[in-house]
Amino acid sequence: MSCQIYPSQMCPGKAYKNCKLNIMNFWEVICIYYFALQGSFLGILVNLPILVTTLPLLPPALFFYLMYLFALPLKDIFNIFFPSLDPILIPILIFFLVGVSRARLSKVFKWR
């Protein structure tokens, strides 16, 4: 089975040949949905096993992708003051943002 999906501007350099997909990479999960759903019916049928397998991963993938987009400007600001932390800054910021959002939600909804 070969995937007939080609890269676009959204995911440059990501052609999925022989359906070798790292489902733990949220960017690739989002890309496979983007390509399959913008394509033809045949594109959806060819990638149906991948789409079904990654369906439970889609909400967390979208959540972490949005967190990543939100952390990019913060990373640029922190990079000015702490350039040595550049390789690990995005994971630190995402961890902090997720922790703060959970703390705020728990106060609003009284979760314990």
Curated annotation (Swiss-Prot):
Localization of this protein: Host membrane
GO CC term (a single one): host cell membrane
Keyword check for Ubl conjugation: no
Membrane-spanning parts: 26-46, 50-70, 80-100
Principal subcellular localisation of the protein: host cell
Transcription in keyword set: no
Membrane topology annotation: Multi-pass membrane protein
Keyword terms: Host membrane, Membrane, Transmembrane, Transmembrane helix
Cysteine disulfide partners in this protein: none
Protein name: Putative transmembrane protein ORF112
